[in-house]
A protein has these predicted regions:
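Leucine-rich repeat
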Residues: 1-564
Length: 564
């Protein structure tokens, strides 16, 4: 802290609210008095002179004016930071224990905070290997025998230096987070952990992507070191089958873990069988030649506590894994299918999702399907209900390498998606893409597999004639079927290309559904030919004389609501 006599001339004059009060004895307590008093104690200490060499002068000042000393002590006692209980302060400190700068700053606020921080071993258990050696040594010393959390985000290549630091403290490490290891450093760490008595709660070990190969280090799940393991994240490191169930494991993250040529889908299933309390699972595999056939065709693994599952791999691996697992109803499933350009086909969805959705119990309550197709993007979302309170149950993307146009996948992919959810009671269907590619036959087959559809929303470009033609003239098998779109009530179309023929089809559709007691409540369109189209539509309404529509305008939308 600089001396007050240096900085005081440069400070602005105090305002009325900042002027010191005059005490009954006539002594004025100002910032200068406090700074000068502290300077006599702090400056000698900072300059290397022992603090005990000059406390006499400060003590003499306080002794000469007991009232001043009493007021100073009373003032310090009323300062908010000195009135907080030590237990509460420590809880606040622990929130920032991963920040080295904040921990150093805590010791420089006041004597009370410094004493509290230095005597709290748990505050110094988080060690970042990028910090200065002096600070790391101080953390190890101040943490005493408390469990350690070791973190590093930089590339670690020297295994000898890493082992020199890790080995003496391996027994009290509770969380290890090393995100960028060389292969040699990872292998040395694996050897050290096998023979140790470490009992970690969280392990994150990732080999740098540039160092990964088919010959990967192997992480052995020994019984003595995994009984408290709650979180495991491996990248570019193989994992051996556990010798006993991992009863405490709730989070598992595997990236390029099964690169070896001998890896099979049974290796994944064996691991999942030994994780009875698993809640979060993430598997990211870029290997194209992964054997996906299970030794037992009827093998099924139930993951009863799983809440979130994320898969990023090629379609064959995803399909093989989804056909062998049983998921609970409240699981959120995220899928990213990696497909090559020559592998782009409408059958991709049928390849990924098992027939009848298999054991994917989380998709049993799907009520809303969203499909988005644009250039090299093909995305599917599925929700458990319609509206803002809906919970996403399926999030599936197709990723081409290299990028390719997937618009041609829309017709058949939409049919395959409808087949997969044919018995799921889907009420809402939203499609964004070039629906001009969808012919009448495609629309009819989609509606035939979604008999409970109530709401259709379509975006992007295309003509609407084929959609209304399919609703007007179903196939011969569905012509007399009263369940064909019997619940359809609302149709929203954005960017539609409208003409006289479109107006005629829409008017006829509304009239027919009204006669069949399947009234279409709302038909909303957003188009550029609004005025011309309204004239066409009103003309068709007058000709039909079977139903009356109430027009509403909102921004660029036209709402037609049927009135009885």
């Amino acid at each position: 802290m600089p001396c007050a006599s240096i900085w005081w001339p440069y400070l602005p004059p105090p305002t009325a609210s900042q002027r010191p009060a005059v005490s009954p004895s006539g002594h004025i307590l100002t910032s200068v008095n406090i700074l000068e008093l502290l300077a006599e104690i702090i400056v000698p200490t900072v300059s290397g002179i022992p603090a005990e060499a000059h406390p006499g002068r400060a003590s003499a000042k306080l002794a000469a004016d007991p009232q001043h000393a009493s007021r100073l002590l009373s003032h310090n006692a009323k300062v908010p930071i000195n009135r907080l209980p030590g237990e509460l302060l420590l809880e606040i400190f622990y929130v920032h224990k991963l920040s080295s700068a904040l921990r150093i700053g805590l010791t420089h606020v006041c004597h009370h905070w410094r004493e509290l921080a230095l005597t709290s071993p748990l505050l110094w258990t988080a060690i970042c290997l990028e910090d200065r050696v002096e600070f790391v040594d101080a953390c190890l010393r101040r943490s005493a025998v408390a469990p350690l959390t070791i973190v590093s985000r930089c590339y670690i290549e020297d295994e000898l230096a890493l082992m020199k630091f890790i080995a003496p403290h391996i027994g009290r490490i509770r969380a290890l987070d090393l995100r960028s290891l060389s292969t040699s450093a990872a292998e040395a760490l694996m050897r050290q952990s096998r023979g140790s008595k470490a009992s970690m709660e969280s392990v994150t070990l990732h080999v740098h992507p540039g160092c990964r190969s088919l010959t990967t280090p192997t992480f052995v799940l020994a019984r003595n070191s995994t009984r408290q393991l709650r979180s495991l994240s491996l990248g570019g490191i193989a994992i051996a089958a556990p010798s006993s169930p991992l009863t405490a494991l709730t989070r598992l993250d595997l990236t390029d873990t099964f690169l070896a040529s001998t890896a099979t889908i049974d290796d994944i299933l064996d691991l999942l069988e030994n994780c009875p309390r698993l809640e979060t699972l993430s598997i990211n595999e870029r290997c194209r030649r992964f054997p996906v056939k299970s030794k037992s065709a009827d093998r099924r693994v139930s993951i009863s506590n799983l809440r979130h599952m994320r898969l990023a791999a090629h379609t064959a691996l995803i399909s093989g894994l989804l056909s062998c697992i049983i998921l609970p109803s409240d699981t959120t499933l995220e899928i990213k299918c990696l497909i090559s350009t020559h592998g782009v086909s409408p059958a991709s969805i049928r390849t990924v999702l098992p027939d009848g959705l298999g054991g994917l119990g989380n998709l049993a309550a799907i009520r809303s399907l969203h499909v988005f197709v644009s250039s090299n993007i093909f995305r599917i979302r599925a929700y458990d209900m319609v509206g803002s309170a809906a919970i996403k149950k399926l999030d599936m993307d197709f990723d081409n390498d290299p990028p390719a146009d997937m618009s041609s996948m829309l017709p058949q992919a939409l049919v395959e998606l409808a087949r997969s959810f044919t018995s799921r009671g889907v009420r809402d269907l939203q499609i964004v893409g070039d629906y001009g590619l969808l012919i009448e036959g495609v629309w009819r087959e989609v509606f035939a597999h979604l008999p409970y559809i109530q709401h259709i929303e379509i975006g992007s470009r295309g003509t609407v004639n084929k959609l209304f033609a399919a609703l007007l003239a179903p196939s011969s098998a569905d012509a007399t079927d009263p369940s064909f779109c019997r619940d359809l009530r609302r149709i929203y179309i954005r960017g539609a290309q409208l003409d006289v023929d479109s107006a005629a089809r829409m008017s006829t559709l509304a009239a027919n559904r009204l006669l069949q007691n399947r009234r279409l409540d709302t038909l909303a369109l957003s188009c550029y030919q609004r005025v011309r189209w309204i004239l066409h539509f009103q003309m068709m309404v007058k000709r039909s004389r079977l139903w009356v529509s109430r027009f509403q305008f909102r921004e660029d939308w036209i709402f037609m609501r049927t009135l009885r």
